[in-house]
């Protein structure tokens, strides 16, 4: 073994050895027996290699010699003499002589140049692999010298004679371990023919099979502005340490305006500072810290399809792993042709070595633009792409475009990546920088070859023709993954749904060819050759070539970081990398495929525990659903969901989940590989897969509602109220409310009951039924009704009469309306009344409008309808007929105000409302007889309800669903707040019952109205929501004539109404006109429900009842695009967690209506709950309310009791429970007071204790002590021990003491309003704002 110490030997001896070797090589060449000169003359070769840097010099000389030595006619002696001359010449390591010699040789015999070049290149490749020389005795052994020490030109010589053979001989000779060890710099001995090593290493020295160029881009960074692009990658990437890449270029940014930066570019330097080795956050910080002005980015732009990650991470390994196809390159970097080809300067594979020494100045670059070119015909390596005008290289004039960089400062670069070569060039020390390049004797030929290679690379990218490259990349990835990249592969597999790996394989192939069946996990049945490398290659080629595959790759890149990986995946398959690697590759491909279509929800993927089975199941399901079983798309989607499951699912979860129910979705997605449509289609499939139907159904239903939030009973209530005032609504309500309710029940039922949901959803199609109901119901709009007309009182009387007079509610329409309301109320009542049901359940049921009822939809409807019928019984039968005609038909006839008395007797507020407007009382005769035919008794009412339910109720139910769509009722904030306020289960049950009952009854009315007004629009789905809103708004507009700005309903009125009912006092009619509106709504409820409700209300203590006072449902009538007249403050992301009214604009709608006040908590807007939302989301909901012509706002005044309860509910369950405890304890003992303190620079003059997470647990925030001399001490407005409920409009429930102090600090100096709860009944100096 030669030791490295030999590297210090004199250059002369090395030169002589090289000369002798050149002579031997010449002899060997002339024999042209194809055997390696290394094998024939191992000692000289080994010796030359052993010389280290000296060897390098000699190598160059030898290269010259070998190039001539080829099949040249020049005698060996001539070569020797030339070599001697070079030796003698040699100052500066004889570089100039070498250059002259090379040129001379090229002129004398161009044919020799080719072999020399071939050898040089092969040796170069050898060097990266064999970093250390091992055994001198073995001529075929890999040279262990590090690449920097190896004289690769010489090695190239040695390899040159083997030009022909490298194609077949050397491709796979080198073991993986050897290849890995050598690049790592290990000195492990490997007995291999040098040529095989060189061939194995001939894989693109550029470090990637994709052509890429390094260039500088100057961008202008403005003040407080970015550069207009986002980045991914970093050494902390889940795929392993990778560079920083451009992910997205934003339109309108600096990068887009410049136009040179491309997505997928690797950022090497920022203002001259290297980005290598940075984590993602570090890179972001670098960009953020960059000062405004001109920024210089050094980027590597790929001219072809993105390469595999492995190529980035370990290019040398990748190259060494190249397959036999790459071997051809090793024979000569530019020559695929056999070396025996006749020597001719015109031959493109001929090369000469030229050394150029450039003088580098401090702080100035050399001006050499580099590019790496994948193997193409006879070209591969790192080349001079451009020379900057005026630069050192340009002025020197010796370097040409198309020159291949062979060595820089005595360091071979064939084993280096483009990035590494750039780093070497850019960081050279000032002074002479020797560069050895290889070029064709005619520089123009080299330049043309480079251009063609780049153009071909681009073409390959476009048409996916890089099969061999891919296979090579695959091999590279395979070996590289084994060597140090396994983590990257593993991460890919993990991220890309490892359970589906096999299927993913198949999917990749299938995805590459959408026509393939990916049912078989191993490969699509159609692509049985998938296992075969060639077929795999083709398939992979197709997949990358397909825009779908690549675009998805880009999408996956966001997740996987590098878009470049997509092509390598197929390659890995071609090269038959380990299954794991193949899978990972396929996974990457699938990701892109799936990325286009929205990924199905994770649930769907979870269901498929076995990737193959799941794939097969998906195929089966897809087949059953009529979709092709292509699992590739499915798997891709599965992978995507895993990668991007929640976002995509959130966007499409309803439909996608419906589509995803199980295997079915996957196939559908595949069939619709292009994207979302497939998912939509998958929804039917979801039905086919019962397992996921329930969840999917719910999601689908949510989709239909176009709001993921739960329906808001308050919104419905408000809508109902609007409709109540509008006779049209009441009329429409007859028909529509029942059906809409049914549809709601069905949809809700689907949500509540996954099993039942899918069919119901299918039957209803989410919205169709509702639409139908809307269509079925057509009613003329009547004049607007005042918010609290006399009919309210009458309705109260009627309600009371209802108890006394069973004929009071006979009107079938009324009964029908009450039926849905009563039914829903019954559901809510069931929820609330059932003591067994938990508050949360009640809340959820309340939010979903009796989701608990959903299981018993039919029964509940019937029971509710009969109950409503019974409730209606008390009303007059004659009225029953009228209302049935009016409401049931939703016919143009309007109620006459004269009839309000009858309406009151019937007790249907809607009817009374309709009459008040002066709408013609006479219902369509057809309907009247129908309703009349039904006996007034409960049975007839049930019949009427059933019949009307079929006609009107179905629509009514649908209308609620429409309403939900129009106003996403998915979230019922007020309901949630009440129900979530677990302070007292009684209070919440009552609130849920009342709100649900009112909401349902009102919903029936408004839904009918909206249905009548927009019978067809609701069918459109999302439009129905807006349309229904607009319709209701139109109705409201009719009402607005009487109520210009709108009206408000206080839940306390409902409470009083229930009390009035219990007391049966008619005096209350006049006293509680507003209450009567609520009472009129309640009148729709069945007597049984009312009795139960009354009983529960009786049980409630006053403190709990008082909490109802603060909740108001306000309906504002406005023009489209008009604001609501108030602004919002607070949010889950702010100190003030509760969304409150920040300011009421003087001339706005809210100010004109008068109910909404500054500081009120906003529970929901147009059915969208604001509970737990961020400030930004709340503002977005507020802006969305501009579109409809009606706005329904549920607010809660900061009354002493209502506010804390609400706050507690909004803050958290724990705080809510704590607040509930407090409220329960303090109901009889505590007094809620509002005080005003002056905030000074020193604060409010008191300290706090308690709070969430205190030493004593979650306690309310209380005043600990009052500072002496403070205004609070002098005024004695507050006392130690007082609980702070609200401070400056910010609820303090559930806050930590630190958060409370931050709120106090943030308050402006001046008067501050504080709501406190004092445990003693004596509230001396406070204003009893919360006693009510």
Curated annotation (Swiss-Prot):
The gene is IL16. PROSITE patterns: PDZ. Residues 481-495, 571-589, 605-620 have a biased composition (Basic and acidic residues). Residues 183-452 are annotated as: Interaction with GRIN2A. It comes from Homo sapiens. Keywords: Chemotaxis, Cytokine, Cytoplasm, Host-virus interaction, Nucleus, Phosphoprotein, Repeat, Secreted, Transcription, Transcription regulation. Residues 216-302, 355-440, 1112-1197, 1234-1319 form the PDZ domain. Interleukin-16 stimulates a migratory response in CD4+ lymphocytes, monocytes, and eosinophils. Primes CD4+ T-cells for IL-2 and IL-15 responsiveness. Also induces T-lymphocyte expression of interleukin 2 receptor. Ligand for CD4. GO terms for cellular component: cytosol; extracellular region; extracellular space; Flemming body; focal adhesion; nuclear speck; plasma membrane. This is Pro-interleukin-16.
